[in-house]
A protein has these predicted regions:
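N-terminal pre-ligand scaffold of iron-sulfur
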Residues: 1-60, 74, 78, 87-104
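Short cysteine clusters
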Residues: 45, 65-68
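Short Gly/Pro-enriched loop/turn and capping motifs at secondary-structure junctions
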Residues: 71
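Short Gly/Pro-enriched turn/cap motifs at secondary-structure boundaries
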Residues: 83-84
């Protein structure tokens, strides 16, 4: 199946400065709202599989997994600080009215 944008949630459901987990076609995805810009990525730390929405602390575009201290850039998924060494998968996001669409 080719990737396509699907409506995932309403933007109003994700307050600025927060990270929320949603299920999109059976994939658990975390969505971060950084000052009105939305980023989507796998809701699983690549170190020990903690939920990034549940255990993540967002500071600007840096998400820290409080399970063990790994840091990720929510824009790219890149690891900024260990112990994680593998980036998180990111998903393209677009806005349609109040709907947030994620490409899966």
């Amino acid at each position: 199946m080719a990737a396509e944008f699907v409506t995932a949630t309403k933007m109003s459901e994700i307050p600025s400065g927060s990270v929320t987990a949603i299920d999109v076609r059976g994939i658990r995805i975390a969505v971060a709202n950084v000052g009105g810009t939305y980023y989507a990525f796998d809701d699983e730390c690549t170190h020990e599989q903690c939920s990034l929405a549940e255990y993540g602390e967002l500071a600007g575009t840096t998400l820290t997994c409080t399970c063990h201290g790994s840091e990720f850039d929510v824009r790219t998924g890149k690891v900024l600080a260990p112990p994680a060494t593998v980036p998180v998968k990111v998903y393209p996001v677009r806005v349609a009215g109040d709907a947030l669409e994620i490409e899966v």
